């Protein structure tokens, strides 16, 4: 189905810079997200028909569409995030390519282009309307496509009371891209049986498995002396960092793994001979493998300290989120419903693990099973990001189908 306000709504949203900041100590991490929620989203939530609309100190804008059929007793939530990834988001100037011809798309005057030879996903979209960047920013389809789709579904249901639906709760939240947005999510206030994050990629994505994730911060304490008289005295902290890294499995890196394979990912190294720091992220799907990865890093640190004869390697491990499959597989109702709705719409469900996490990873462990459904974005987090309007329309269809489902 086509929705006349969907495209303009999306274009309005992406032009607002809501980039999050991992170094911030506030919630949300940037004032622009507060402004977007209070000045743009909340007024529109009220206009499209949501009731009891409010903004929480945790950065979430919340609203409710009451059920219009007493036989539909479920309460279902839909959640999308306001922030965009760590890439230029100032001055987003989307291009709308109608009836895409399957060829190369020049991204404004930037010199960058979307070429099917480089981005095979384009082969799915001839004849469709694509929204791209101008090559100087990201687009923000992750996850403003999700926000636009949820808002459009509510607007349509309000205008069509003949479509009977259950109670719907909507939540638009901050800071998903920096991994802290759902930390303060109020599951008791949201009060639904289950929810969906509308934060996936291409048509048909339906996901209930994520990585389990941890961060590792390492400090290496060296001893700097003049290199000319260094023998037997110098301890080079940078060399310690190299030695630590070289003891990790060389093939367990993001660029060499896929599917259900986990990894260690070196994110940052800074320092000097005297002192160095390294940051890693650790990812795996199975709980035992995840715990083993953390234990392996600790073992390497302990071994190095023993060999050095002093405590020069310090490791701090922090769990970030866990594989939501552990929660959702106890009751697969949200997956069963979404799968049935997609199939009724002629959409082939793509049920694969997410090699990442969503807000649903944390919310599921707060007591609300929250799988993820497609929002349409491709090549997210950079200048080559784009989305199909037709896929966004199908996401709206899917949301409407889920809340009207009678099975």
Swiss-Prot record:
It is found in: Cytoplasm. Binds 2 Zn(2+) ions per subunit. Belongs to the peptidase M20B family. It catalyses: Release of the N-terminal residue from a tripeptide. This is Peptidase T. GO terms for biological process: peptide catabolic process; proteolysis. Its cofactor is Zn(2+). The active site is at 83, 176 (proton acceptor). Zn(2+) 2 binds at residues 142, 177, 381. NCBIfam families: peptidase-T (TIGR01882), PRK05469.1 (NF003976), PRK13381.1 (NF009920). GO terms for molecular function: metallopeptidase activity; tripeptide aminopeptidase activity; zinc ion binding. PROSITE patterns: ARGE_DAPE_CPG2_1, ARGE_DAPE_CPG2_2. Its main location: cytoplasm. Zn(2+) 1 binds at residues 81, 142, 199. Pfam families: M20_dimer, Peptidase_M20. Cleaves the N-terminal amino acid of tripeptides. GO terms for cellular component: cytosol. The gene is pepT.
């Amino acid at each position: 189905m086509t929705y006349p306000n969907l495209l303009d709504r999306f274009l309005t949203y992406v032009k607002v810079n809501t980039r999050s900041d991992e170094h911030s100590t506030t919630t949300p991490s940037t004032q622009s997200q507060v402004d977007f929620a209070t000045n743009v989203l909340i007024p529109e939530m009220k206009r499209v028909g949501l009731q009891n609309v409010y903004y929480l100190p945790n950065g979430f804008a919340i609203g409710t569409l009451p059920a219009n059929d007493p036989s539909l007793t479920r309460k279902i939530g839909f959640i999308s995030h306001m922030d965009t990834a760590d890439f230029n988001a100032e001055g987003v100037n989307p291009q709308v390519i109608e009836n895409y011809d399957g060829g190369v798309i020049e991204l404004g005057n930037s010199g960058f282009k979307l070429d099917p030879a480089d981005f095979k996903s384009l082969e799915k979209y001839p004849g469709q309307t694509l929204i791209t960047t101008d090559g100087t920013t990201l687009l923000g389809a992750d996850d403003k496509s999700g926000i636009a789709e949820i808002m459009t579904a509510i607007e349509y249901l309000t205008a069509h009371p003949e479509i009977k639906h259950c109670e719907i709760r909507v939540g638009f939240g901050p800071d998903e891209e920096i991994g802290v947005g759902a930390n303060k999510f109020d599951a008791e206030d949201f009060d639904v049986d289950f929810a969906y994050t509308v934060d996936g990629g291409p048509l048909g994505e339906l996901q209930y498995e994520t990585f389990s994730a941890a961060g590792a911060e390492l400090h290496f304490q060296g001893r700097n002396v003049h290199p000319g008289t260094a023998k037997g005295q110098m301890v080079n902290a940078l060399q310690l960092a190299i030695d630590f890294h070289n003891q990790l499995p060389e093939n367990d890196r993001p660029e060499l793994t896929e599917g259900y394979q986990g990894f260690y990912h070196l994110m940052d190294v800074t320092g000097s001979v005297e002192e160095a720091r390294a940051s890693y992220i650790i990812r795996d799907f199975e709980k035992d493998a995840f715990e083993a990865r953390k234990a392996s890093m600790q073992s390497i640190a302990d071994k190095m300290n023993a060999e050095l004869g002093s405590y020069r390697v310090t490791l701090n491990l922090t769990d970030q989120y866990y594989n939501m499959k552990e929660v959702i597989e106890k009751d697969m109702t949200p997956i069963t419903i979404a799968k049935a709705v997609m199939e009724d719409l002629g959409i082939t469900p793509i049920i694969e693990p997410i090699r990442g996490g969503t807000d649903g990873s944390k919310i599921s462990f707060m007591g609300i099973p929250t799988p993820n459904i497609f929002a349409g974005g491709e090549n997210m987090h950079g200048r080559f990001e784009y989305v199909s309007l037709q896929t966004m329309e199908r996401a709206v269809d899917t949301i409407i189908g889920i809340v009207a489902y009678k099975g």
